[in-house]
Amino acid sequence: MTIEKSVQGGIEILRLSGWLDTQSCPQLEAEISLLGENVCTLVLDCSGLEYISSGGLRLIVAAYKQMKGALMLRHVSDEIMGVIRMTGLDRRLNFE
């Protein structure tokens, strides 16, 4: 997986490409742990995300809790959205 990072004001955007699975979760977890105190919103741009595992979903939920709900998923594919809906997380997470 590759992660491209950009900051716009207090919004940090992480553009994810590839697979978010057990092997790549530590990479995203490390990026999230580096968020500064001045970041008020985290946006995960999923436009390049091809696959997400249960471990990836757990990491997103953990980030949602860390950000106290100020996490937004952007450009989620129909396939990934289907997985999110299957778990019921579509009613908990924020989408753009």
Predicted regions, residues:
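Short acidic-hydrophobic, aromatic-tinged amphipathic segments that line or gate anion-handling sites
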Residues: 94-96
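Amphipathic alpha-helical interaction surfaces in cytosolic regulatory modules
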Residues: 20-92
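Short beta-strand/loop segment at the start of cytosolic alpha/beta domains
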Residues: 1-15
